[in-house]
């Protein structure tokens, strides 16, 4: 799915109402049902995938809003997680190999990030784990800006790692 080109509903209005209706054990109105059906189609696409590849930049230490929007749309009760009063939140998706390629202007691998914090990696790890995907390998690429030599070295390192991962992906 290309999050910049494919349709993603805004997570508001009827789709938001549908989420909380389902969490509260209430039925949907017609408008809520229609809105939830869109989220369901997107979540089913993920549920049926044998493997997942997420390629994203790091923006302001986090993820782009479109990736966050996709996570909000697919993280729905009864589709990708459920709630049990005795056990809490439980994932509904089966685990599958997942690779996250994360490009950043800074170097978060060797510590040359000048004290900045990578908030994208822990967020994505937890968001995916919450719905059942824990076999996640992160491939950081950075720096992507600045002097040519560190950029070249980062690209080569990421390429080597991706070649290794591809053999079993």
Language-model features and meaning:
Residues 73-80, 122:
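Gly/Ser/Thr-rich active-site loops/lids in small-molecule metabolic enzymes
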Residues 1-76, 160-169:
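N-terminal beta1-alpha1-beta2 submodule of the flavodoxin-like/Rossmannoid cofactor-binding fold
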Residues 38-39, 85, 120, 158:
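Amphipathic coiled-coil/heptad-repeat helices and related helical stalk/stem segments
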Residues 111-169:
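Glycine-rich phosphate/pyrophosphate-binding loop and the adjoining helix
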Residues 82-130:
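Short, glycine-/small-residue-rich phosphate/pyrophosphate-handling segment
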Residues 58, 104, 142:
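Residue-level signal for short, function-critical loop segments
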Residues 49-50, 95, 133:
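Short, well-ordered alpha-helix to beta-strand connector turns
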